[in-house]
Amino acid sequence: MARFLRLCTWLLALGSCLLATVQAECSQDCAKCSYRLVRPGDINFLACTLECEGQLPSFKIWETCKDLLQVSRPEFPWDNIDMYKDSSKQDESHLLAKKYGGFMKRYGGFMKKMDELYPMEPEEEANGGEILAKRYGGFMKKDADEGDTLANSSDLLKELLGTGDNRAKDSHQQESTNNDEDMSKRYGGFMRSLKRSPQLEDEAKELQKRYGGFMRRVGRPEWWMDYQKRYGGFLKRFAESLPSDEEGENYSKEVPEIEKRYGGFMRF
């Protein structure tokens, strides 16, 4: 018994749902008929709806309306509204694919989800640029001043890519300047006057990587400084007095006479 009562309740609920859908369809069909006629008063809307629902024994008005719907069905805007929406969506997606290329392949699903979550209202269509700027961060902003949106979008992408290249160039230049500063600190002013080619710079970097701090500039040893302080300019004058290769023969002849005169004092 309990199962039978439960089944009856389910049937009543299902029947009420079907009745509501039938009533909605009947009212919509009768509205289409009255819209199609030149004089909407020729068909009684209430009588047509009741005949469609089966609450009146006569079906004269409903039969007339049904014939009219079958003849002029493609002309009704309600029938074509779904097709129009689908075609408009396809056209929009095709245009976006043309404008932004692979960008829509990568982020198209995200933008479609955003459109489904936040649909644009009719009163917001006039301010479409502001809505797109808020939604997509200004990247998909429409330019209302110029008509060629494709050219504008391509210019925008070129500017974005150009800024990326400029940033990469700036970072590369900054790294090169930092390397130059390090080289100038390490080698003093010796490397400033040299204008090297990129190939020489690469070779210098390889040498630096290979030998590390071995190539750093090293000062004179302490014993050389003490030696220089002790003997002063005597060594310079002695080096200047040494003969060249051309004067070697004459000097070899004069050496015995000097040794006879000064003995072993001039030996070094």
From Swiss-Prot:
Keywords: Cleavage on pair of basic residues, Cytoplasmic vesicle, Disulfide bond, Endorphin, Neuropeptide, Opioid peptide, Phosphoprotein, Secreted, Signal
Region Disordered, annotated ranges: 163-184
One GO biological process term: cellular response to virus
Compartments where found: Cytoplasmic vesicle, Secretory vesicle, Chromaffin granule lumen; Secreted
Sites of Phosphoserine modification: 252
Post-translational modifications: Proenkephalin-A is cleaved by CTSL to generate Met-enkephalin.
S-S pairs: 26-48, 30-52, 33-65
Site positions (Cleavage): 111-113, 133-134, 215-217, 219-220
Prodomain positions: 197-208, 218-228
Tissue expression from the record: Spermatogenic and somatic cells.
One term under GO cellular component: extracellular region
Signal peptide feature range: 1-24
Source superkingdom: Eukaryota
Primary subcellular site in the record, as a coarse category: cytoplasm
Family: Belongs to the opioid neuropeptide precursor family.
Name this protein carries in UniProt: Proenkephalin-A
